[in-house]
Curated annotation (Swiss-Prot):
Entry's localization field: Cell inner membrane
Chain ranges passing through the membrane: 6-26, 356-376, 380-400, 447-467, 489-509, 525-545
Species assigned in the record: Xanthomonas euvesicatoria pv. vesicatoria (strain 85-10) (Xanthomonas campestris pv. vesicatoria)
Top-level lineage group: Bacteria
CC per GO annotation: plasma membrane
Keyword NAD: no
Gene that specifies this protein: yidC
Protein name stated in the entry: Membrane protein insertase YidC
Membrane topology recorded in Swiss-Prot or TrEMBL: Multi-pass membrane protein
Pfam family, one: YidC_periplas
Annotated keywords: Cell inner membrane, Cell membrane, Chaperone, Membrane, Protein transport, Transmembrane, Transmembrane helix, Transport
Assembly mode: Interacts with the Sec translocase complex via SecD. Specifically interacts with transmembrane segments of nascent integral membrane proteins during membrane integration.
Length: 574
């Protein structure tokens, strides 16, 4: 397979992939409002108004049992106690990286203080929000069939005041809340924030000073009305996965997009040692229970809200006894190094390089190299260039093999033309004679294609690394490029990319190319240039450097194999 056809195949594969993603995104956007309007959960979804049946909260410690797929466990009235003096006041907790507004039961608003919404702005990203158009909350509460549990507004801060801030030099902020129920039952909830950490520790202690056993289970959920993204090939937010993900030791990493949220009837599954999360571009929220505690994992819809919930563990607390449960709530960016510090199996997959494990592994390896280059170069733009250079050096033997195969094929083009003239329209005899020639001269017709097929997964994985890595968000390179995730404001990199593609075409020998292929090749630089004009500068930088190095390698290989680059350019210009 000659070099031109290989390039053409690769180019059209890229265009086809981008068009397919664009079509899928537009189709999802058209269907999303209908799904939100038609899917609803039973009224028993609200744990403040309902709870599992007696069979689901036994006197021992198992969690509520899963029902049939797509259903919610049978429920009846909860013995929830109303707040003694109305809704609890909203309390603000502030660390160096987070500002949370909560009522003791729900985190109503979460601002990421080190991530401004815009490059030049000061307003931080609000990941959790009370915005009535797109509410997004994290909630943890208790449910029971017979025993009293805290309702909305039931938890109150133990300390006076509504604002708690981590002081300079302080590494932790601990804020306890308490619910005092009837008959001597109380639940103490403690929020712990740590400096530089996006995982919030939430510990509940059930203290039973009554004269009867207390039965109940904890639930933890994430709920949001998904934002309908503007769809476009140049919008990285629409490329990224948006939806729920969960992990179990048995099944591994799984995910469900918001547009497909109730496919296969949602989710009802008992899991020990997992986690559940809602993902969007660059950021995510997750509930991470204790490793040894089992929970019922539920995906459902509550009107326009998509809900991901953990139910359990369940407790029976004897009179005079105490029981506790603890979980982490992650609210923050997909920072690889901080996620690794949480030491949670499978949580690294929230950096969603691909739903396929092999591509995700390649992506993780590429980011590992990229991050180490950044630690040395202190600039993500130069780190991208360094990574492409290393990849090109590592893959040089494949590129050389690809070109040598193409050069060998070109040397036998006159003989192939003679065979075609000899056998005319007898395609069978022509193919037989061609294969005999290949066998005699030890030519592998796939020699130019196989190296490309090996390289493609690596470069596709690198593309997703650049799209998904929050570390590159609003990061500058040099001069006019002050944000690698925004488009080039002066279109310099896209124009360079067009020039490099044009030069590559002119340098590529094209003997025997039919007129249709030649016309298609002439338009390819322009097609790619238009697409690249509005893509993030970091991606275009990758393409420019990769294409430029490819051009240099091709020039070198042509000289090595005795062909005159100037003559090739003159021939292709005709």
């Amino acid at each position: 397979m000659n070099q031109t056809r290989v390039f053409l195949i690769f180019a059209w594969l890229m265009v086809a992939a981008l068009l397919w993603m664009e079509w899928g995104k537009d189709k999802a956007a058209a269907n999303a409002p209908v799904a939100a309007a038609t899917q609803a959960v039973p009224a028993a979804r609200d744990p403040d108004a309902a709870a599992p049946s007696a069979a689901n909260v036994p006197s021992a410690q198992p969690i509520p049992q899963a029902g049939a797929p797509g259903t919610v466990p049978a429920t009846s009235s909860t013995a929830a106690t109303p707040a003694a003096a109305g809704a609890a006041p909203v309390v603000t907790l502030t660390s160096d990286v987070l500002r949370l507004k909560l009522d003791g039961r729900s985190v109503l608003d979460a601002e990421l203080l080190q991530f401004p919404q815009t490059k030049d702005g000061t307003e931080p990203v609000s990941l959790l929000t009370e915005d009535p158009a797109h509410p997004y909350n994290a909630t943890s509460g208790w449910a029971s069939e017979h025993s009293p549990v805290p309702g909305v507004g039931g938890f109150r801060a133990e300390q006076p005041g509504t604002t708690f801030e981590m002081a300079k030099g302080q590494n932790t902020l601990v804020v306890p809340f308490v619910w005092n129920g009837p008959d001597g039952v109380s639940i103490r909830r403690t929020f712990t924030l740590e400096r530089g950490r996006y995982a919030i520790s939430i510990k509940d202690e059930v203290i039973n000073k009554s004269g009867a056993p207390w039965n109940g289970y904890v639930f933890r959920k994430l709920s949001r009305v998904p934002t309908i993204l503007s769809r476009g090939m140049t919008n990285p937010d629409s490329f990224s996965f948006n939806g729920a993900t969960w992990y179990s030791p048995q099944e591994g990493y799984e995910r469900r997009a918001f547009k497909d949220y109730m496919d296969d009837g949602g989710l009802n599954r008992q899991i020990t040692g997992g986690w559940v999360a809602l993902l969007q571009h660059h950021f995510f929220t997750a509930w991470i229970p204790q490793k040894d505690q089992a929970s019922l994992y539920v995906l459902a819809q509550d009107g326009p809200r998509d809900v991901a919930e953990l139910r359990g563990p369940a407790f029976t607390v004897a009179p005079g006894q105490t029981a506790s449960t603890e979980a982490r709530l992650w609210v923050g960016p997909k920072l690889v190094n901080l996620i690794a510090k949480e030491d949670v199996k499978g949580l690294d997959r929230v950096v969603d390089y691909s739903r396929f494990s092999i591509m995700a592994i390649i992506g993780q390896g590429l980011f590992w190299v990229l991050s180490h280059l950044h630690s040395f170069l202190h600039n993500w733009g130069w780190a991208i260039i360094g990574l492409v250079v290393l990849l090109r050096l590592a893959l040089y033997p494949l590129s050389a093999a690809q070109y040598k195969s193409g050069a060998k094929m070109r040397r036998f083009q006159p003989r192939l033309a003679q065979l075609k003239e000899r056998y005319g329209d007898d395609r069978v005899k022509y193919q037989q004679a061609t294969m005999e020639l290949f066998k005699k001269e030890k030519i592998n017709p796939m020699g130019g294609c196989l190296p490309l097929l090996i390289q493609m997964p690596i470069f596709f994985a690198l593309y997703w690394v650049l799209v998904e890595s929050v570390e590159l968000r609003q990061a500058p390179w040099l001069g006019w490029i002050q944000d690698l995730t925004a488009r080039d404001p002066y279109f310099i990199l896209p124009l360079l990319n067009i020039s490099i593609m044009w030069a590559t075409q002119k340098l590529t020998p094209t003997p025997g190319m039919d007129p249709m292929q030649a016309k298609m090749m002439q338009f390819m630089p322009l097609v790619f240039g238009v697409m690249m004009a509005f893509m993030p500068a970091g991606l275009v930088l990758y393409w420019v450097v990769n294409g430029g190095l490819g051009l240099l390698i091709q020039w070198w290989m042509i000289r090595q194999h005795g062909e005159k680059p100037s003559k090739i350019i003159q021939a292709n210009a005709k």
